[in-house]
Amino acid sequence: MAANVESMFFVRETPWHGLGTKVQEAPTSKDALILAGLDWHVVQEPVYTGQNELVRGYKANVRDSDRKVLGVVTDRYKIVQNEEAFSFTDALLGEGVRYETAGSLQGGKSVWLLAHLPHEYIISGERISPYLLFSNTHDGSGAVKVAITPIRVVCCNTLNLALQTAKRSWSMNHTGNVKDKMEEAKNTLFLADRYMEELGKEFENLRKITLSDKKVMDYICLLYTSPSPRDSTSS
């Protein structure tokens, strides 16, 4: 399947692969979950050999909607359900979250959701509208990852690019106390949002600074002062 997209939704602008459900207005998390085809749960079941012997220490992650095995993981693996990803984003960004895209990749093994941050930022005179990206795997191949990115994720390639180039990101393995780790992520990403806002203000303040003609000439002289005879003959 093109771009490894199993199901997705997008707002207005159709992705290059043409797949998914198009909507005109950003949906709520409840509607986005359904539109993206993510309204299913992962359940863990025992793993058996061909001779019907129990494989200890391992579980199969199974999608409840069609009984598809998404992956085999250790019994220490903690599931993060799709609806928990949306709940996390709702809690972090607050009321009126605008979801841009969300979907399932590689037959449900990987999922993502993309939401607008609540503020636009003006940096060096340019208006920037970054997204909050939440990605998760159900096959045991990767961590839960959350990042701030300007990239509109619509497929495997754009997901990988967004995660690789994100300046602010957070990740969590599917082990230990998952709820505590996700609470920690909220605090980390809240600070990142504040950082972006302050950075935008600082650049805007610098942009407004004007220099007198004399100050400009002083800088030019400083940059282009001829080297002294000692400097020109040294080697």
Across the structure, where does each feature detected by a protein language model lie?
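Intrinsic disorder/low-complexity polar-acidic segments
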Residues: S87, G94-S226, R230, S235
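Feature for intrinsically disordered/low-complexity regulatory segments and propeptides
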Residues: M1-F88, L92
